[in-house]
Amino acid sequence: MTQPSLNPLVIKLGGAALSCSQTLSQLFGAIASYQQKEQRQIVIVHGGGYLVDELMEKLQLPTVKKNGLRVTPYDQIPLIAGALAGTANKLLQGQAMADGLNAIGLSLADGGLCQVEELDPELGAVGKATPGDSRLLQTILNAGALPIISSIGLTAQGQLMNVNADQAAVAVAGALDAQLVLLSDVSGVLDGKGHLIKSLNQQEADALIAGKVITDGMIVKVQAALEAANDLGRAIEVATWRYPENLEKLFAGESIGTQFLPA
């Protein structure tokens, strides 16, 4: 049985993993194998930007981003909610079920898990999530199921909102008092010699950015991870799904990527 000291684990799943059934099968297979031996509770939070991009292209609708966040016109949110809370969520649920897991598909709104408000009028139907009531989610976890949660939420007035998946994962982890791992294409942050940096704070990250060690798209990932650690008030981890043999170590509380430290 799991040590009582291990809090639930929230895994934010992103990057190319969402579009690769083999990668997903390796991830869910590792979760199934781990949970046969240990009882740590695991939650998946996902986005699905690639599905939205494909949908927008098919419908010949422009994709506009502001400061890295997708602008979501209110007349498009039903389509985007369908892609994320519908297609992406059910594809993940289906793969998890095929790999032997009792998976349940949810959104941020279910059971009042997260409270969502409009983030910025210029972004349209884009929401900011804050931790809400985790009782329904905890009941599902206690039943031995794997919740798979999309980053679609509802305001108190019932308005659909698209929430950045990293930020959604922070809110879910906050509601559950859980450890958070952002699982993506990258193994973490590398130093100038290509070695994995085990932990990073804002001051160290600023120095690496100034020294051109952290560049381009990685700057956005690093700043988002540090912001997530600050929001959650505890260290979070960025790790990769590329090495399934390492995933069970991650589930057991061992660091396999870069730990981002709150200020």
UniProtKB/Swiss-Prot annotation:
Its main location: cytoplasm. One of its GO terms (cellular component) is cytoplasm. Catalyzes the ATP-dependent phosphorylation of N-acetyl-L-glutamate. The gene is argB. This is Acetylglutamate kinase. NCBIfam families: argB. It is found in: Cytoplasm. It catalyses: N-acetyl-L-glutamate + ATP = N-acetyl-L-glutamyl 5-phosphate + ADP. Pathway: Amino-acid biosynthesis; L-arginine biosynthesis; N(2)-acetyl-L-ornithine from L-glutamate: step 2/4. It comes from the Bacteria. InterPro entries: AceGlu_kinase-like_sf, AcgluKinase_fam, ArgB, Asp/Glu/Uridylate_kinase, NAGK-NC. The record marks 12, 221 as: Transition state stabilizer. Belongs to the acetylglutamate kinase family. ArgB subfamily. Keywords: Amino-acid biosynthesis, Arginine biosynthesis, ATP-binding, Cytoplasm, Kinase, Nucleotide-binding, Transferase. One of its GO terms (biological process) is L-arginine biosynthetic process. Its EC number is 2.7.2.8.
